[in-house]
């Protein structure tokens, strides 16, 4: 399996302290791989100088854009994809809790399993996690809910690194309505519903200790969005409608 160009879509929000270093680290890694690539940084309405820090890099392989207001990671990724030109697309969170070098692991799984989509999975048996206990508990409960509602052949949907053949996103993104909490789930449910093969790969996650307690509002919105996906899939069959 070959590809002509990789588009790395990197959503960021209020990351002015680390964003420049993280982008340079990402650029350096892909430069050493010797592949054709572009890095598209989408600032999701940051209130600090994140966007300015990216622009200051003046790197021809890095394109920077900014949303007028904060609309959510999902919307940022959709807008970034519109700017992309690669036939292979990777989602990569801008905080680099997951290092870009894991692209090689995901791409190898894509080749080996002849998959259309490969997602990093915190629940993969070979994953290495520096991950708060409260987040692990929430992940386990959410996995149970997703399995119950959708029966997806996946153990994780929310990890911030994913690799797609661009055609998958071209055929699914226009149907994705969720902008924030369950965006990843809706995209993967839709891809699976359309018959694309999705595989999982192990990840090394190095959370940097910036997470506090999970807010009740976040949990509520996550569950609400998840039920909305179920409603669109099984009740009104929105994803089957032509658009």
Q: What is each of the regions a protein language model found here?
A:
Residues 15-18, 46, 73, 99:
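Donor nucleotide-sugar binding loop of glycosyltransferases
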Residues 63-83, 88-91, 100-181, 207-227:
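Acceptor/aglycone-binding surface of glycosyltransferases and processive sugar-polymer synthases
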Residues 43-51, 96:
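A conserved acidic beta->alpha catalytic loop
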Residues 1-28:
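N-proximal low-complexity "stem/linker" segments adjacent to membrane-targeting elements
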